Amino acid sequence: MVLMLPIATDNGARLAAILPTGIAAVARGLGVDPIEVLERAIGIKQGAMGAAVGIDSDSLPVLRSFVVVVVDGLGHANLQARSAHARSISRMPTRRIETVIPSTTGAALTTLTTGRLPGEHGLIGYRIRHPELGLVSTLKDWHEISDRRAWQRSTPLFELAAAIGAKPVAIGRPAHATGGLTEAILTGAEYHGAVTIADRCAIASRLLRAGDPVVAYLYVDELDKAAHSEGWQSDLWLRRLEQLDAALDDLLRTLPGNVGVVVTADHGMIDVPEHRRIELDVDSEKFSDVAEVGGEPRMRSLYLRAGSDPVDVSRRVGEGLGKLAWVGTRSEAIARGWFGPMAPGVAERLGEVIVTARGQLSFTLPSDSPDARAMVGQHGGLSSEERGVPLALGGALEGSGFAAMVGRLAAISPATDTAPLTD
């Protein structure tokens, strides 16, 4: 039996709406037309926002500064399960939203900083096909990509933040201050590096208390690293969560009164035990038309040999894997709204057949490194645990209607089918 690909009723549009909504709230606080800012942020023509239900200036909070704290790998379900160890975050009003498809870092961080879904910005998976270089990782393989801002197609929103009079900043590890992905998704932001989570939050606190209006992106990847190495249910992951919570508590206690904070994530995590890491038999008959395999263990992308029929390959692979995976063609995934609107040339970055793991399992390859095979915590797929992320509100955003505005902004996209959030 071949399982039909599910329809994406939420393809990450709310995640995409967070930074546009925050910048618009700062614009309102600075006396700049926030509706025009929203139109520019999401790429619709001037005046078009007026017809959208519930989208008006009075629906936005009035902010001096805005901070989005992006915690790599902190899923909504992960946070709920360990809420006793994250008391500061758990006190924040929180809604569950969904990340992009695939639920992977390169795709989701780019959506967060550009306000565009993967089909538009182009970083549509972990290992995807470059027209000249072949399969490349969207996190690591940037050194041979000459035009990085063309490979990532969408403009980061930090330039818009500067245009309204705010200071755009990005705060993360010193090691992330330069590099291909940083250049592609953080262009326009002034980078501040700090080794520890506490020091990153301290930098944010100092900048916010300096007086100038700020739009800040603060990135924490320690939980993701801990989950990959030992699992999100490990003691190491729990220690990282406690460190994050303590640092955020200090940040929230030192906030000026007109600063809004969002805590969210790029994806959640599931733990995959060793016996559920299934090696794909790429030399078998059912894979005979497959030239290369990309993606990642929870969502594999099959690139076919010239002349192969994607429908036939999808059927054969799907019959072989049965209930272990959703298997469908690239065209089917696009038609079911997985990636949002598709810009020219982006579909070809994916393989013609998509294999998505179901349950707590993953699909490894014979060529995978020992480190890749040993990964416990994983993501990339469609499960509720992977795709559900928090939208937690702090500071001036508590009780402000910010979450509802995020939902309304997401819902006006013709490529999405989402119900507005309510506070």
Predicted features, each with a name:
Residues 1-423:
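Feature captures the catalytic ectodomains and active-site-proximal regions of enzymes
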